[in-house]
């Protein structure tokens, strides 16, 4: 079995550090849920995620040193890089808004990505190999790192939007302030009895409002990075293959992702949408990014594939 075979490869320092990061994130997960249930912030969770982030940074640097190239040449390396950027984005978000709901939402995503890299991929895909000629370019660091950072920001921002949908629970919620400000929610629905606990309602709306604002800001950063990544990728493609755009499956899905999040930002900035409506668009964008990043890779098609099933 693929899962069991990986424990015999822990003599590799790169794989060992990835496993250590997995353990740290795994241990932090129940504490994240406990903090959420008790409505208390856990410094232990932030410490564990911070240490995992440092371990992954050291792991990537070690792979870079051993392989001689930027560590994003296959699906394993890119998943480790995605986990590193995701934990970093989580720590940055928690500095802006310290609330137990943040790690409870975002930690499972980092655990999923590092678990997939460590246990789901075959051993031969975890080994660093030589770069293909097209990747031997200074654009590798610029383009791929920016794209991966954009994926992290967009995916985590979309998860925050999903949390808004879950917390609002089908109520029509609106924010009286702007997307960048801190306003107050109002609901079009009332309870059947006409009585609402003001303390719990204020706390719920405050969480939703802050999550909505954080999602908007995080997705905005991710969208700008994705735009920069697409432009740099087009320049690199022209140098490598003589064409700015070849409608490769990865390029096509990246463009679809860009259009979805452009629609999200347009709805918020131009139409003034806030709360559930843009959150639905962002949640749909999450699925598109997953298809763009994982789906295309695992099918093993196109110039950008780090495929496994069919390669």
Swiss-Prot record:
Q: What is its main location?
A: membrane
UniProt superkingdom: Bacteria
GO process terms (BP): cytochrome complex assembly
Q: Name one GO cellular component term.
A: plasma membrane-derived thylakoid membrane
Q: Where in the cell is it found?
A: Cellular thylakoid membrane
Say yes or no: keyword Kinase present: no
Record keywords, A-Z: Cytochrome c-type biogenesis, Membrane, Thylakoid, Transmembrane, Transmembrane helix
One GO MF term attached to the UniProt entry: heme binding
InterPro entries linked = Cyt_c_assembly (IPR002541), Cyt_c_biogenesis_CcsA (IPR017562), Cyt_c_biogenesis_CcsA/CcmC (IPR045062)
- Chain segments annotated as transmembrane: 14-34, 47-67, 70-92, 101-121, 146-166, 218-238, 252-269, 281-301
Per the record, membrane topology reads: Multi-pass membrane protein
The parts of the chain that form a coiled coil are none
What is this protein's function? Required during biogenesis of c-type cytochromes (cytochrome c6 and cytochrome f) at the step of heme attachment.
* Quaternary structure and partners: May interact with ccs1.
| Annotated family | Belongs to the CcmF/CycK/Ccl1/NrfE/CcsA family.
- The protein depicted here goes by the name Cytochrome c biogenesis protein CcsA
Gene coding for it: ccsA
